[in-house]
Amino acid sequence: MVKHQTQKKGVKRKQLKNIPSGVVHVKATFNNTIVSITDPAGNTISWASAGKVGYSGSRKSSAFAATMAAQDAAKNAMNSGLKEVEVCLKGTGAGRESAVRALIASGLVVSVIRDETPVPHNGCRPRKRRRV
């Protein structure tokens, strides 16, 4: 019995072109830094993380890895015509400030820097203290 193979349709990506302004979300944890660039409506233009750039293990948590991730995300977003961004920081990792510096150095105009780090109003019980 002959089985007919159906062609798989390739996933078509949306082409987001000429987006002059956007929002950069920087999530800096103790283990990694994730940089997502969206349009004002929240649709993702580009993203990068320290792991995606090529770092693994404890090197992902370094400030230099966050710089490389921010440069990679900014370069891809500027190909879509992005010029001006608002920066939303979340978390207390090592890559917070270095990611913002890399965005400015890559040629993006930063209009606002917002800190949206979630702070509990005495919510869940924290995990146990580390004993080294």
Swiss-Prot record:
> What InterPro entries does UniProt report for this protein, alphabetically?
Ribosomal_uS11, Ribosomal_uS11_bac-type, Ribosomal_uS11_CS, Ribosomal_uS11_sf
Q: Keywords assigned by UniProt? A: Ribonucleoprotein, Ribosomal protein, RNA-binding, rRNA-binding
Give a yes or no for keyword Hydrolase in this entry. no
For molecular function, the Gene Ontology terms on record are:
rRNA binding; structural constituent of ribosome
* Function as written in the Swiss-Prot or TrEMBL entry: Located on the platform of the 30S subunit, it bridges several disparate RNA helices of the 16S rRNA. Forms part of the Shine-Dalgarno cleft in the 70S ribosome.
HAMAP family linked: Ribosomal_uS11
Q: Which family does it belong to?
A: Belongs to the universal ribosomal protein uS11 family.
Entry protein name? Small ribosomal subunit protein uS11
